[in-house]
Amino acid sequence: MKGELLLFSSVIVLLQVVCSCPDKCYCQSSTNFVDCSQQGLAEIPSHLPPQTRTLHLQDNQIHHLPAFAFRSVPWLMTLNLSNNSLSNLAPGAFHGLQHLQVLNLTQNSLLSLESRLFHSLPQLRELDLSSNNISHLPTSLGETWENLTILAVQQNQLQQLDRALLESMPSVRLLLLKDNLWKCNCHLLGLKLWLEKFVYKGGLTDGIICESPDTWKGKDLLRIPHELYQPCPLPAPDPVSSQAQWPGSAHGVVLRPPENHNAGERELLECELKPKPRPANLRHAIATVIITGVVCGIVCLMMLAAAIYGCTYAAITAQYHGGPLAQTNDPGKVEEKERFDSSPA
């Protein structure tokens, strides 16, 4: 009897846990919706209904997400964490959310994202990272996101974006990139090429407006011609690996080349995207070609006119001298014929 009573009590407690709604939250069981927004929460509430599909946690004071922070809601599809104080996302913070489709992390204090942070979100369709302080995104944030269609990273501190990260999102159709600190140098050429192909295929983007260097500040990256890019310099050889032993050096002494303290600065300057220098005499060359063509045309016309004039003059002269000559020749022929006829047979 006591065993049955204990079992019954356990079932009651379990049902209360499953069906309960956390304090300061509003739960709607018919739609599996839980709203815990604007409650001054500092951490994720415990005892969330496991059948929750939509969870709103925006406008709180959550600073940190531990690993497996949402293990109690494995069926979650929409998660809104916007306008909190998140600065640290532990690896595996979203582990177990196999069905998550929408993740909103806008208006937080994120500085960077750990590689493969979202690797457990295969169904993710929308990721909003806008209005943070992110200065760098890794080349990968997880497995290939076959279903991701919207990525927003506007209003951050990004200077570069690796093309490999975008190539891991073959289905993306909307890309929001504005209001960052884009440095339009040679390292952004790969991104430019990817964006041109993306737009050509019908993708939508708000563009990349260059913040530096001053030559291109305020310009749209997609409107800068390819010809204006300088190739990125090759990485400087490692002085340690490039050590060489000169022939004839005594006792195997290794001579190191002198260090160039300005190499890094020079590489940075060479890498700046700057206009391709145009030859100083290019306009003069074009003008020379045009003038030469005009002169040659005039000379050809003059030669043609001279040829026509010469032929006409020759024809008129021949006709003029041909008439009298014919008349003077005829009497000779007659006289010769008479002498021939009068000769003895």
UniProtKB/Swiss-Prot annotation:
Keyword Transcription regulation in annotation: no
Domain LRRNT: from-to ranges: 28-50
Superkingdom, taxonomy of origin: Eukaryota
Pfam families cross-referenced by the UniProt entry: LRR_8
Assigned keywords, A-Z: Glycoprotein, Leucine-rich repeat, Membrane, Repeat, Signal, Transmembrane, Transmembrane helix
LRR repeat positions: 51-72, 75-96, 99-120, 123-144, 147-168
Extracellular side stretches: 28-288
Stored InterPro entries: Cys-rich_flank_reg_C, Leu-rich_rpt, Leu-rich_rpt_typical-subtyp, LRR_dom_sf, LRR_TM_domain-containing
The protein, known as: Leucine-rich repeat and transmembrane domain-containing protein 1
Gene name of this polypeptide: LRTM1
